[in-house]
Regions:
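Gram-negative bacterial Sec-dependent N-terminal signal peptides
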Residues: 1-25
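N-terminal periplasmic/intermembrane-space "pro-region" immediately following the signal or transit peptide
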Residues: 22-108
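Outer membrane beta-barrel
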Residues: 83-238, 251, 255-260, 290-293, ...
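Residues that define the transmembrane beta-barrel architecture of outer-membrane proteins
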Residues: 92, 133-142, 171-175, 213-217, ...
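Outer-membrane beta-barrel translocator domains and adjoining extracellular loop/strand segments
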Residues: 110-115, 166-176, 197-203, 238-249, ...
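Transmembrane beta-strand segments that form the barrel wall of outer-membrane beta-barrel proteins
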Residues: 156-167, 230-239, 263-274, 354-358, ...
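Detector for outer-membrane/organellar transmembrane beta-barrel domains
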Residues: 227-228, 252, 257-381
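Outer-membrane beta-barrel "beta-signal"
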Residues: 389-395, 401, 418-432
């Protein structure tokens, strides 16, 4: 029995051994395949890691190159800005501006003075040495200006110097020269009373009847009453050659912005007129407006009433007359107005239509005291039309026609009391 069991066990073991060998053989093959797959996976991971590292290095190189380019660009840009910024020896920022201006005029009728600009108050009366068929040209209105600014812990200090060549015999002439600190201005600039802001645009550098281009040495204070209203007070040297200046002219101007399109300016002036033997108070009021009808259409108007002064508003008669003893015996009063409309047709073209009128009071005492009634005017008027063309931004070309007349208080020997101004003006400007 035992022998049978041993034989049976032996036979079972003998039969199972080949099967175990076959199973072991299969397991080894699978392990080898797994090892090969793991090895391939490791190789693939290594290649992927190398690729990622290479990409990262390339990205760093690109970013580094980009940063270098950006730094170079910023450095170059900064260099240009620094090169363009001008400073004075004292450290003030400096801005240069101005224009080169060529004026020409063909005068069919007009004044006898050699200058080509407005002479309406002195044009010869008809038939009396009229200056007709004259061509005139000049570059004297060429302008050069410097703006200065110094920053301080309190507030900025600014200044301006501007000159042209409209002095005697084309001599250099100061237009503006002033210091501005806070609300205060000291120096020479536009009069606080006779401002040019409300005159219609002209080519003529001296403007037309009803306007004023007066610049005076002055001390000015600007007080802001609100966001839309400010009051400007000034003491001015009116440079009136007919008067012995003892006290400055006092002027006041109230500006009010009604809305984005309408601006109004009310002005007043009082000054003393003095001779060696007498004194008289002169005064005046003014009212100006600027109205933007549309974004491309603008109306300007300015009105003055003045008594006893001829130094602020252009083209007026002498403010006062004296006798042989230097006593003031009469004063002149006048009213003047100018109005015009400017239309911007497109970015290159714009044009203006304007009209100006001045009328003196019929003061018989003044008229009878005139030494020459043909040289004082009962009234003056001028009308003009112009067009400006700007082919490119720095260049401006203009053409203008103006006609006007003056009527004297007394007739010339031939009986004429009227003189005419009849001109065509042209201008070419390069602004910088």
């Amino acid at each position: 029995m035992l022998t049978f069991k041993l034989k049976t066990l032996f036979i079972a073991c003998a039969c199972s051994f080949p099967m175990m060998s076959f199973a072991a053989s299969n397991t080894d093959a699978e392990l080898q395949q797994l090892r090969d797959e793991v090895k391939a996976l490791k190789l693939l991971m290594q290649q992927y890691a190398q690729q990622q590292q290479s990409n990262a290095q390339n990205l760093q190189q690109v970013q580094a190159q980009s940063n270098i380019t950006k730094m170079n660009a910023e450095s170059t840009s900064g260099l240009k800005i620094e090169t363009m910024r001008l400073k004075t020896k004292a450290g003030a920022e400096l801005t240069l501006y101005g224009n080169v201006r060529a004026d020409a005029s063909y005068q069919a009728e007009g004044g006898s003075a050699t200058r080509l600009y407005n002479q309406i108050n002195t044009v010869p009366l008809a038939g009396n040495s009229e200056s007709s068929d004259r061509l005139k040209a000049t570059l004297a209105a060429t302008r050069l200006g410097l703006d200065f600014k110094t920053s301080t812990p309190d507030q900025d200090i600014s200044a301006k110097i501007e000159v042209d060549f409209l002095g005697t015999n084309d001599a250099l002439r100061i237009r503006h020269a002033y210091i501005n600190y806070g609300n205060w201005l000291v120096g020479q600039t536009w009069s606080n009373f006779a401002v040019p802001d409300y005159m219609p645009e002209t080519i003529d550098a001296l403007a037309y009847v009803g306007g004023a281009v007066k610049r005076t040495p002055q001390v000015r204070y600007n007080h802001k009453l609100s966001q839309i209203t400010n009051l400007v007070l000034a003491a001015e040297d009116s440079k009136d050659e007919s008067s012995n200046l003892r006290l400055p002219a006092l002027t006041a101007r109230l500006n009010h912005q009604f809305n984005e399109r309408l601006l109004l300016s009310a002005r007043a002036m009082a000054t003393e007129k003095k001779t060696d033997a007498d004194t008289e108070t002169a005064w005046g009021i003014g009212l100006g407006t600027k109205f933007d009808v549309t974004d491309k259409t603008m109306i300007k108007a300015d009105y003055y009433h003045v008594k006893g002064d001829s130094s602020f508003v252009s083209w007026s008669n002498s403010g006062f007359l004296t006798n042989a003893n230097k006593e003031i015996i009469a004063t002149n009063a006048f009213d003047s107005i100018t109005i015009g409309i400017t239309q911007q047709f497109n970015p290159q073209f714009k044009g203006t239509l304007g009209y100006g009128y001045m009328k003196a009071d019929q003061n018989d005492t003044y008229i009878n005291a005139l030494p020459d009634k043909t040289k004082a005017n009962k009234d003056l008027w001028q009308a003009w039309a112009n067009v400006f063309y700007s082919p490119i931004k720095p260049i401006s070309l203009g053409l203008e026609y103006v006609y006007g007349e003056r009527e004297a208080f007394g007739p010339a020997p031939n009986g004429s009391q009227t003189g005419s101004d009849n001109r065509v003006n042209a201008v070419a400007m390069y602004n910088f």
